[in-house]
């Protein structure tokens, strides 16, 4: 878990196409309007990604099971995600739970992430018997496979993740940020 002072964000510079200030504004908007589940129903290779700090040099490939959660003195969005630099197969060990939040006074941005096992994704890259064939479209295949996996992921009960999303949510609800 990381806690950032939001007053420091302008001094961090624009380290990514969506810098600290932009991520802060995106999170504020999301917490006001809520999360449209359809936003997390399809693979994405770029914006509009859900807010995520700290910045990593990859794109959010998907979000799943988004939910607004309140903690002792703030609220945020939790979701399951995966980041990649391209349309690579999602591997089980690279999927994680994240929570992105603000304290009630807006002074602190809270970011937490934990690995989770879903039981949906492979642990090794799958074989590709059609790779190299003239009509093979790797992006179309990636989109179709990941789309099916996201249907399963978004429908999966929270207790079927390891650790359970409910357990991680309870951990998040217990967080208290003090000056």
Briefly describe each language-model feature range.
Residues 35-107, 113-125:
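Signature of long, low-cysteine stretches enriched in small and polar/charged residues
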Residues 116-179:
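Surface-exposed amphipathic alpha-helical segments
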Residues 109-110, 163:
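Aromatic-residue detector
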Residues 1-50, 112-116, 120-121:
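A short acidic-to-branched-hydrophobic micro-motif
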């Amino acid at each position: 878990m990381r806690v950032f002072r939001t007053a420091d964000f302008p001094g961090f510079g624009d380290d990514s196409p969506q810098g600290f200030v932009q991520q802060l504004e995106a999170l504020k908007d999301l917490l006001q309007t809520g999360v449209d589940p359809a936003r997390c129903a399809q693979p994405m290779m770029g914006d509009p990604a859900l807010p995520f700090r700290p910045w990593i040099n990859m794109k959010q490939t998907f979000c799943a099971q988004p939910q607004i959660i309140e903690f002792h003195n703030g609220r945020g969005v939790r979701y399951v995600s995966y980041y990649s630099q391209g349309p690579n197969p999602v591997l089980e060990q690279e999927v994680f739970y994240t929570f992105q939040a603000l304290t009630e006074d807006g002074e602190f941005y809270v970011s937490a992430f934990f690995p989770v096992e879903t039981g949906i994704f492979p642990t090794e890259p799958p074989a590709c018997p059609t790779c190299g064939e003239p009509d093979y479209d790797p992006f179309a295949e990636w989109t179709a496979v990941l789309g099916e996996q996201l249907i399963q992921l978004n429908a999966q009960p929270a207790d079927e993740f390891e650790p359970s999303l409910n357990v991680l949510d309870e951990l998040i609800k217990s967080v208290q940020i003090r000056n």
